[in-house]
Amino acid sequence: MINVNEFRPGITFEFENEIYVVISAQHSKQGRGQANVKTKVKNLRTGAITIKTFSGGERVEKAHIEKISMSFLYNDGASIVLMDDSTYEQVAIENTKITWELNFLTEGIKVKLRKFNNEILDIELPAKIELKITSTFDAVRGNTTTNPTKRATLETGYEIDVPLFIKEGESVIVSTEDGKYVSRG
């Protein structure tokens, strides 16, 4: 059992027969009332992100998630195929479980497969990933008032805002948590 006051990003727990991972947790106490813990959590079975509020001191069951290092092989349209780096065993995961992660998957990338009691839940990407820019337009001279950016399409098809000095064909580092530009690759 784990106390909700100990919630930190990355902690996994079972609640109402579902498995969740904490994205963010905020503790609040109002006047004489009891403290609450407002959490943003991701359901690892459905991929849905919700906000749950727990009473301070409430306890939930800790979920012991097995993480296996895998390499991304390919996407066949309905599911992705991963290969275990040590046993060369291949595993397929439905695209519906990993819609956000699909924006950052390139051939050969290392990911962690999350399993709970032999049930495949989803994948965990590295915090930052290097991707190539396939298309962007040239900067317009004079368009530099405050922190100017332009739209760019990555090799996976995902679109992000990048600084004006980034050109087509360059590599950039992108955060997989919020999908934003971090730095040049």
Curated annotation (Swiss-Prot):
Keywords: Cytoplasm, Elongation factor, Protein biosynthesis
GO MF: translation elongation factor activity
CDD domains xref list: S1_EF-P_repeat_1, S1_EF-P_repeat_2
Free-text function comment from the UniProt entry: Involved in peptide bond synthesis. Stimulates efficient translation and peptide-bond synthesis on native or reconstituted 70S ribosomes in vitro. Probably functions indirectly by altering the affinity of the ribosome for aminoacyl-tRNA, thus increasing their reactivity as acceptors for peptidyl transferase.
Disulfide topology: none
Keyword Secreted found: no
Name the record gives this protein: Elongation factor P
SUPFAM superfamilies (alphabetical): Nucleic acid-binding proteins, Translation proteins SH3-like domain
Gene3D superfamilies listed in its UniProt record: 2.30.30.30, Nucleic acid-binding proteins
Recorded GO CC terms: cytoplasm
Family: Belongs to the elongation factor P family.
Pfam families: EFP, EFP_N, Elong-fact-P_C
Any one GO biological process: peptide biosynthetic process
Subcellular location: Cytoplasm
PROSITE patterns on file: EFP
SMART domains: EFP, Elong-fact-P_C
Pathway listed: Protein biosynthesis; polypeptide chain elongation
